[in-house]
């Protein structure tokens, strides 16, 4: 998954997350060869299937999964990989692209899914950085500092959490809710597709 679709304000953190996710993907292939991790942690609960993928709500509010991180059942059977991360920062959702032979429609609402603890990032990575004390004073001295200060305002884009297909919705409104300011964005900000009223996966 590319980081190019991420909103500019949250760019630094999201690009870091994407790079980590790609690394996680490679790690996942190695891990699959070596078997599942020694322990798995609960990361989400299944809400409903969307386009043959699982839409899950995040149940670990201080952690965000890597993109492409393997997702397991409690018995460590791998069922898929994290495909997209969606929704506002205080109500995060993610989709799981299923492994061959696995059907998202076979799961029941609130079924738990699990992840290796090594495939999680602290949510602080995706929050705006606090302003440095005295930064305004230095910027107020004028000259080149002032434009930089204004440029820094771009970080407002990272205020919330994740946006794109939005958060949950009913089956008809699949992934169609949240979005807009302050959200995780994924797979580009393409024009809305007709199918659930959500943003597409890129142009």
Curated annotation (Swiss-Prot):
RGG-box 2 as annotated region, ranges: 150-202
Compartment list: Nucleus, Nucleolus
Source superkingdom: Eukaryota
A Pfam family hit: Gar1
Region (RGG-box 1): 4-28
Main localization of the protein described in the UniProt heading: nucleus
Regions of compositional bias (Gly residues) in chain numbering: 1-28, 140-195
GO MF term list: box H/ACA snoRNA binding
GO biological process: snoRNA guided rRNA pseudouridine synthesis; snRNA pseudouridine synthesis
A Gene Ontology cellular-component term: box H/ACA snoRNP complex
Subunit structure: Component of the small nucleolar ribonucleoprotein particles containing H/ACA-type snoRNAs (H/ACA snoRNPs).
Role this protein plays: Non-catalytic component of the H/ACA small nucleolar ribonucleoprotein (H/ACA snoRNP), which catalyzes pseudouridylation of rRNA and is required for ribosome biogenesis. This involves the isomerization of uridine such that the ribose is subsequently attached to C5, instead of the normal N1. Pseudouridine ('psi') residues may serve to stabilize the conformation of rRNAs. The H/ACA snoRNP complex also mediates pseudouridylation of other types of RNAs. The H/ACA snoRNP complex mediates pseudouridylation at position 93 in U2 snRNA.
Family, as annotated: Belongs to the GAR1 family.
Protein name, as recorded: H/ACA ribonucleoprotein complex subunit GAR1
Organism, scientific name: Cryptococcus neoformans var. neoformans serotype D (strain B-3501A)
Source lineage: Eukaryota, Fungi, Dikarya, Basidiomycota, Agaricomycotina
């Amino acid at each position: 998954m590319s980081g190019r679709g991420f909103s500019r304000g949250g760019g630094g953190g999201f690009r870091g997350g994407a790079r980590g996710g790609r690394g996680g993907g490679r790690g996942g292939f190695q891990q699959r060869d070596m078997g599942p991790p020694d322990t798995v942690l609960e990361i989400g609960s299944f809400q409903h299937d969307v386009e043959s993928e699982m839409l899950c709500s995040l149940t670990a509010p201080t952690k965000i999964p890597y993109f492409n991180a393997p997702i397991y059942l409690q018995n460590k059977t791998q069922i898929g990989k994290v495909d997209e991360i969606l929704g506002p920062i205080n109500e995060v959702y993610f989709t799981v692209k299923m492994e061959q032979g696995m059907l998202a429609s076979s799961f029941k609402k609130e079924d738990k899914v699990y992840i290796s603890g090594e495939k999680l990032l602290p949510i602080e990575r995706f929050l705006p950085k606090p302003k440095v004390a005295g930064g305004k004073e230095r910027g107020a001295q004028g000259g080149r500092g002032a434009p930089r200060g204004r440029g820094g305002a771009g970080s407002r884009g990272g205020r919330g959490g994740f946006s794109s297909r939005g958060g949950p919705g009913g089956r008809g409104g699949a992934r169609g809710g949240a979005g807009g300011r302050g959200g995780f964005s994924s797979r580009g900000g393409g024009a809305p597709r007709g199918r659930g009223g959500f943003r597409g996966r890129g142009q």
